[in-house]
Amino acid sequence: MTTPVQSYLEDLHARLAQDDSGTVADYIPELALADPSSFGIALATVDSAIYEVGDTRLPFTIQSISKPLTFALALESRGEMVRERVGVEPTGEAFNAIALDPLNPLVNAGAILTRSLLGPDPDGSLLRGYSAFAGRDLLIDDRIRESESRTAYRNRAISHLLRGAGRFAGEPDEIVEDYIVQCSVLVDCRDLAVIAATLAAGGRNPVTGRRVASPDTVRDVLSVMATAGMYDAAGDWLYDVGLPAKSGVAGGVIAVVPGQLGIGVFSPPLDDQGNSVRGVRVCEELSHSLDLHMFKHAHRGPSPVRRTFTLAELTSKRQRDPAVAAQIAREGARARAFELQGDLGFAEAEQVTRAVLETPAEFVVLDLRRVRNIHESAIALLAGLADRISALSAAPRELARVMSAQPFDELDRALEFLEDRLTGDTAAPALVRLADHPVLRGISADDLALLEGLLEHRFFAAGDYLLRAGEAVGELLLITSGVVSETVELASGDVRRVATLTAGMTIGELALLTGGPRIGDARADTEVECHALPADALAGLHELDAHLRAILLRNLLEIVAARSARTRQDLTTLVD
């Protein structure tokens, strides 16, 4: 099944593929051979989900996207020395400007100096470091390396200028060759997304689980990427897109949504600043439509899924016939609830959609009563689950409008709906005989005849109150048909259902046994018939028929115990 995120990316790719503006870099002869129609987009989340569309497995050279990785590796191995030698200021100049002052590690002067700090690399440790970020073994494209080496006049000039000023020791031409090697590492679009996601995850690769950089190092790298990663367009980029990013002249772009996901794009045609035209547009659209600008979100909150459970673990407050209850216990795994929380943006909705699509449950309810805000991007993603969601609880109108799911004001009603779907139990069965009522289980025919003489028949229309909160309870009601809901009023003034009762159940047993007043209302949802056993009649049985009274009290205690067990379950699972 195509996920909502995948559908979104496929639509984005199809639209932006029509943009044929820009030119392929040709100052390195081998780069000029790239197909301008090549185009791939990949997203990788910090919990290892990866989405791809287009030419995501087409290899190309990493070029300047290597710079933040080398900066990270230098910070890890050389520490404060790097900050003392290389600045972090934006330049406002071309990336390959011949400059003595290495203002930041993402322009060539700073990148060459940063590379020099790592020293010679005979055993390929730099490549292994890049591979750790990508989550797989990377290779070097010797054709690109040789082609770039033949035309690296500006980089050699920069290196000699830096060496002449005493900025590093060693041979300047050798440093340039080392720098060219790092730019010639082969990656694909998926690699870029994983690299970006590793930075988004604070230095832990979400695919391999390996930590490749410390959170402090990642903080420093992302800070420079945010202010200098897109060459002399970095200021506009940070203002408009608001994501740390880095581009390369082979057509790659990475962008990082801290704490959430990484973006990788490949498309060779470049704009006047040397950035991939389609790559820039992809990041712009993702940032705007998915609300990813990093300064709009101070931090990532807790998991958007507060809790999830099946009907085998927790049912609604509706009390069922024993046979139906047993069916729910057996088949409850076919229905699952997801309680959501916090602010739902794109990243949070992506987690929710993935969780829903991964569950084997046939019936699903989303409960949104703890969701503070829901962004349009989250609504769009969740709408893609329309055929998987059976019910919504406390959903905002804008979400309910785009879903075909049955809406409910509270989760308990939604759970009852799922139970009905699961079992087909939508009607309230009427008892054929009063003798079938569980309260009368185990009594003889003679005792039943005696008891029928004490019972009073009652009828209630839908909406009538059978009992009110605070009233003294003077009788036990035995329901023989219809549906009754018991509710309590919370301190907030909200009314919460605590039980829904049907034929074969009782009302007032606890208050009758304890002598206390009612703590909630009992109201007829449908027409209700019941039989009332007055409290004084029950007390009089002590002298009239002590055995019958003992049976009735035993049955009532079993009912109270069963309801108490359900109350404990609710408390254990924090249902409120």
Q: What does each model-found stretch correspond to?
A:
Residues V5-Q6, E416-Y465, T502, L512, ...:
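Cyclic nucleotide-binding regulatory module and flanking cytosolic helices
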Residues G342-Q406:
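Amphipathic alpha-helical interaction surfaces in cytosolic regulatory modules
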Residues K67, G463, A472-A491, T502-T506:
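Glycine- and acidic-residue-biased ligand/ion/polar-headgroup-sensing regions
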Residues A312-R354, L368-R372:
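STAS-typified acidic loop motif
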Residues G202-A233, L238-L311, G332:
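Structured C-terminal helix/loop/strand segments within mature extracytoplasmic catalytic/sensor domains
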Residues S48, T61-R83, I195, I263:
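Active-site SXXK
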Residues I263, R497-R554:
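Cyclic-nucleotide recognition modules
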Residues M1-S21, E76-Q182, R190, T198:
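Active-site-adjacent helix/loop patches that line small-molecule binding or acyl-intermediate pockets
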